Each structure stands twice: as C-alpha cells, then as structure tokens.
Amino acid sequence: ATNQHFDLLAYLCDNFGGDIHISLGMTTRSEEAAVVRFFERRGRASDLVLYACTSGYPVAFDDVCLLEIERLKRAYGNIVKTIGFSGHHLGIAIDAAAQTLGASWIERHYTLDRTWKGTDHAASLEPDGIRRLVRNADAVARSLTYKPQELLDVEIPQRSKLKWGTRVEN
C-alpha cells in the first residue's frame, strides 16, 4: 500500500543495504513503472523484489491473475533482482503454480486462527498451512528440472518390464 510513498522508499534506499520487497497489489502499470524507475535512478533496482499481487481478503481464484508473474518477468526481469508472488487466496495450491511460473519468493500472511476478526485473517495461513506450503514448495523446487540423462536410473527396471520392444526373451 506504500509503494508510491517515495519519501519512505528513498529512506529505505539510503539507509537499508538489503533487498527491498515491494508488493504491486492495488497498483496500476504506470505506478509500477514509476517504482522501478525510482529504484533505477537511485542505483538500487538490482536489490528490488517485485511481487505480483491482487489485494483482497480473500481473493477469488479468478482474480489471482497468476500470469502477472510472467508479465512482470518480461517487463522487469532484466532490471530488478527478481519477481515474487504475494497471495491472499484460500489454500496453498496457487502458490505451487506461482512457483512453477517463476516466482522466486512466495509471501503469505500468517495467523494462529483464521476466524479471528481483522481484514486478512480469513486469507492467512495457520501453522499447519505454512508447514504444508513449505513442504509443497520444496517438492516443486526439487521437481523443476530437466532429465540429466535420457533414462533415469529409476526408469531402467521399469523399461525392461513395461516398454514394448525392450524385453529380452529367454
């Protein structure tokens, strides 16, 4: 909500040496371009992490708009440090898809009880949800690879049993 508060962003640029993470929820494309230009002028664009985000609590799946991750990567991927995803949806399935689309960071709200009063508790994850999200994110990260060889070791015994034309007759 403060990504247009340029005095605050200037203070961060001048006084904080780490990565600066900015959500683009509730932000127009001209406003997001202004944020990136601001960080470029200050020599800090390479420390900027932009988050694709739809701000709502909770956000319907139809409004998550995951392909914004790809759009941001095309528009700013060579300028900023990386692109992330900030989710305010129910569940954790969307986060795995965001990771598959190239989101380097996943940001979710955390609560001890989703029934508590407040704007974002309903869209937040409870402790078990966070554990499942981390488990799934790890599985997705490990599986996003190419085969290092034509046949993996796990496939060789299956191939000799199941693939037509590869059985050795006695």
Features from the language model and the residues they span:
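Catalytic cores and adjacent flexible loops of soluble metabolic enzymes
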Residues: A1-N170
